[in-house]
From Swiss-Prot:
The keyword Oxidoreductase does not apply. The porphobilinogen subunits are added to the dipyrromethane group. Its EC number is 2.5.1.61. It comes from Photorhabdus laumondii subsp. laumondii (strain DSM 15139 / CIP 105565 / TT01). The gene is hemC. This is Porphobilinogen deaminase.
Length: 313
């Protein structure tokens, strides 16, 4: 009997390679006879580094090449950071597995300062995320917030070379790259509500490939799946891309799902927040209802302005 081989499409960045190797290891632990190969590739999002993501199509730029490899049969699965996964998929592809979530928080990273509160007025903080920018500007309107692109190493180098006084990165990414010592302070969800799916790894494959889906099934983490799908349901109802000022974070609490969300103007002048509690079976519906509440309370106007390419910054 021939040994089944699974080919993993992945970006070449260190963090993406960590995620692919993580999935490779998990698959081989569950299926010792399985051969798992990595198919590294460069995406548009990795190449275009001089323009904010919001102006060039958002984080979907990080997955299109991987999806093309799936559709053309050059790979069997694609591994993504869930916060980079768009709300819709090409025909024939779908999200079939969500692995156990790591720490979803944002991290305050600085050479000189230990916390956001310590930053002097006029300090320069780097982040390319509109979600982080709007919350930073609300918390500390006296700071200067500037775009920061590139992989984690590039961003840290820019910080170390004095271009920024502090930068905001994902805790999970720093931990995965064994750079946890660079984290000065994790930001609470109240300070910086995470992105949809932040901290989780998702696996996409062809929907007609039942054999591969069966092999992937043991990697799915139910508790994480319920939370991330609720966050994504909220984002889908908002018609939010991956690079918009939207945050959403769900956790289990006393057997129920507690979902929080926000939509903010990039300048931090207005942030609409809301929350819902629901049974796990109703979590996605709660996400939709929360999105509708936010839209009614002013999120629609904020998103319309952002999508017109005229954020109030």
């Amino acid at each position: 009997m021939s040994t089944k081989t699974i080919r993993i499409a992945t970006r070449q960045s260190p963090l993406a390679m960590w995620q692919a190797l993580y999935v490779q290891q998990k698959l081989q632990q569950c299926h010792p006879d399985l051969e798992v190969q990595l198919v590294p590739m460069v995406t548009q999002g990795d190449v275009i580094l001089d323009t904010p993501l919001a102006k060039i199509g958002g984080k979907g730029l990080f997955v299109k090449e991987l999806e093309l490899a799936l559709l053309e049969g050059r790979a069997d699965i694609a591994v993504h950071s869930m916060k980079d996964v768009p709300i819709s998929f090409p025909e024939g592809l779908g999200l079939v597995t969500i692995c156990e979530r790591d720490d979803p928080r944002d991290a305050f990273v600085s050479v000189k300062y230990h916390s956001l509160d310590e930053l002097p007025t006029g300090s320069i903080v780097g982040t390319s995320s509109l979600r982080r920018q709007c919350q930073l500007r609300e918390l500390r309107p006296d700071l200067i917030v500037r775009d920061l692109r590139g992989n984690v190493g590039t961003r840290l180098n820019k910080l170390d070379n004095g271009h920024y006084d502090a930068i905001i990165l994902a805790v999970a990414g720093l931990k995965r790259l064994k750079l946890h010592e660079r984290i000065r302070t994790p930001l609470t969800a109240e300070q910086s509500l995470p992105a949809v799916g932040q901290g989780a790894v998702g696996i996409e494959c062809r929907l007609d490939d039942q054999q591969t889906q069966t092999l992937l099934a043991p990697l799915n983490h139910y508790d994480t799946e319920v939370c991330v799908l609720a966050e994504r349901a909220m984002n889908t109802r908002l018609e939010g891309g991956c690079q918009v000022p939207i945050g959403s974070y769900a956790i289990w609490q006393d057997g129920k799902i507690w979902l929080r969300a926000l939509v903010g103007a990039p300048d931090g002048s207005v942030i609409i927040r809301g929350e819902r509690t629901a049974l796990p079976k109703d979590a996605c519906q709660a996400g939709v209802e929360l999105a509708e509440e936010l839209l009614e309370r002013g999120a629609r106007e904020i998103l319309t302005q952002v999508y017109r390419g005229n954020p109030s910054t």
